[in-house]
């Protein structure tokens, strides 16, 4: 969700990502301060957020901002989120991250906390990430995930679901 926020450091475009408590694992994030939001935060739709150390410094001039509130305006609605965690990207040697002037700041919030912004579509997902132990066969896991989704949504054989592996993404980037 795209929005805006204003702090003592200025006006910022904001990207609000709707996530579960498993986001640090999926996104390869390390906590620098505080905690990530919990399963209870997600279940109860608590207005909490996690931001990166880089964005904290852009927004507030420091990454020591645990417990502070940040107001975000999306779709003509302003909502306040309590900052519970500050992340830092783990070094993996594969990807390079750039920050540029005007780049949106990113707030990760429990997907259930975004109901005010997106209405009752907050529990409708357009994508998901599945991770497994590297010893497991990704083809088998992929087929089981599709089979489970088709069974639960009575859509067997309708090709509603698309698989995209890391290799598929890398191939698109290199083509």
Segment roles from a protein language model:
Residues 1-38, 163-164:
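Short amphipathic beta-strand/extended segments in non-transmembrane regions
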Residues 3-7, 91-96, 170-173:
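A short acidic, helix-capping loop that chelates divalent metal ions and anchors anionic groups
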Residues 8-12, 43-44, 79:
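A short, glycine/Asx- and small/polar-enriched loop/turn
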Residues 18, 132, 167:
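Conserved residues at beta->alpha junctions
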Residues 22-37, 47-155:
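Mid-to-C-terminal secondary-structure elements
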Residues 150-175:
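Membrane-helix entry/capping segments
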């Amino acid at each position: 969700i795209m929005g805006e926020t204003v702090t003592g450091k200025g006006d910022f475009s904001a990207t609000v990502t709707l996530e579960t408590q498993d986001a640090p694992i999926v996104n390869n994030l390390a906590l620098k301060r505080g905690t990530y939001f919990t399963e209870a935060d997600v279940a109860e739709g608590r207005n909490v957020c996690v931001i990166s150390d880089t964005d904290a410094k852009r927004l507030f001039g420091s990454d020591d901002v645990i417990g502070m509130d940040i107001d975000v305006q999306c779709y003509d609605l302003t909502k306040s989120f309590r900052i519970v965690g500050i992340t830092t990207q783990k070094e993996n040697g594969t990807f390079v991250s750039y920050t540029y002037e005007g780049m949106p700041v990113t707030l990760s919030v429990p997907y259930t906390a975004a109901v005010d912004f997106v209405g009752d579509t907050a529990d409708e997902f357009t994508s998901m990430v599945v991770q497994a132990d590297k010893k497991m066969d990704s083809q088998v896991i992929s087929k089981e995930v599709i089979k489970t989704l088709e069974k639960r949504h009575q859509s067997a054989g309708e090709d509603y679901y698309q698989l995209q592996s890391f290799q598929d993404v890398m191939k698109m980037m290199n083509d």
